Amino acid sequence: ALFGTKDTTTAHSDYEIILEGGSSSWGQVKGRAKVNVPAAIPLLPTDCNIRIDAKPLDAQKGVVRFTTKIESVVDSVKNTLNVEVDIANETKDRRIAVGEGSLSVGDFSHSFSFEGQVVNMYYYRSDAVRRNIPNPIYMQGRQFHDILMKVPLDNNDLVDTWEGFQQSISGGGANFGDWIREFWFIGPAFAAINEGGQRISPIVVNSSNVEGGEKGPVGVTRWKFSHAGSGVVDSISRWTELFPVEQLNKPASIEGGFRSDSQGIEVKVDGNLPGVSRDAGGGLRRILNHPLIPLVHHGMVGKFNDFTVDTQLKIVLPKGYKIRYAAPQFRSQNLEEYRWSGGAYARWVEHVCKGGTGQFEVLYAQ
């Protein structure tokens, strides 16, 4: 949703995590979200389905076969991408990948194959992910989300707001904290709008690059708005944490769908994943930081005062297990089923959506 609208943007989302028993790190993750976007009606309705399968081929050498299938229909044109790739860790810092695939757009099709190596495997992880990882490795430093958007200049108030925002960045950021509190910058908005078939003119902002100081906005002291892809990488990094190769002792999968039309955006995700929980010591296990699957990382921009979030989370523990510590605190419990909604949880969700990296800590044991 683009700022400047008089209508309220509402994001509804429901998440469910079902954990396996014992010392297993596996779990099922389900997410559903629906966002009405009255200010950004797509001209081209989009329907996209994604499936990713990961299968271990040689556990000792860390060889994994990834199979990806993506199908989308944009303005009645069907597009497909199929890729199968075998990935192996040659050394601690070196990975090799060999694969093949095919791409089709309408009547056009193309097959391809590839072989590549990655040396010094640096990749970005958000602060939220970092808290679950003892020694994170970053790609391109400490990035935060992009500001990439198209803005319709509908009225003088919006023009003044936009010019003020640009000045606050180009002027060295003296007033940047005030602007960042007023608007929600969530994910690579330009990419989401552009790929969703939404063409909004007459102004296009391709990138902004600003770094925060010691006292950053909304409690975030280390942040950076950077060109091209940090929001996407953040989202991917959260999901890849759920795919630790050393735990991939059976096939894992993610299946998702994305729909956009004049009524808004719908996202659904179902996964069977090997990295949903981690050993926290002392007989405790930690559930990985709440993925917030579609809400935080898939390109929404909404005016702060007109953006509401309605999020629920359900976690189902193995039989005989109990939550020993939870922050934010759960709302209700029925045997091994725990639910979060409203209250401290809602405040935490809003904090994350405004760029915060507030604590989400759930520890459970028998």
UniProtKB/Swiss-Prot annotation:
Spans through the membrane: none
InterPro entries: BChl_A (IPR003426), Chl_A_sf (IPR036559)
Annotated binding of bacteriochlorophyll a 6, by residue: H145
Keyword Transport found: yes
Superkingdom field: Bacteria
Coiled coil (UniProt feature): none
Binding residues for bacteriochlorophyll a 1: H110
GO molecular function, one term: metal ion binding
Gene3D superfamilies tied to this protein: Bacteriochlorophyll A
GO biological process: photosynthesis
Keywords for the protein's UniProt record, in alphabetical order: Bacteriochlorophyll, Chlorophyll, Chromophore, Electron transport, Magnesium, Metal-binding, Photosynthesis, Reaction center, Transport
Entry binding sites for bacteriochlorophyll a 4: H290
Residues reported in the UniProt entry to bind bacteriochlorophyll a 3: H298
Positions that bind bacteriochlorophyll a 7: H297
Subunit and partners: Homotrimer. Each subunit contains 7 molecules of bacteriochlorophyll a.
Role according to the record: Intermediary in the transfer of excitation energy from the chlorophyll to the reaction centers.
Protein name per its UniProtKB record: Bacteriochlorophyll a protein
Organism listed in the record: Prosthecochloris aestuarii
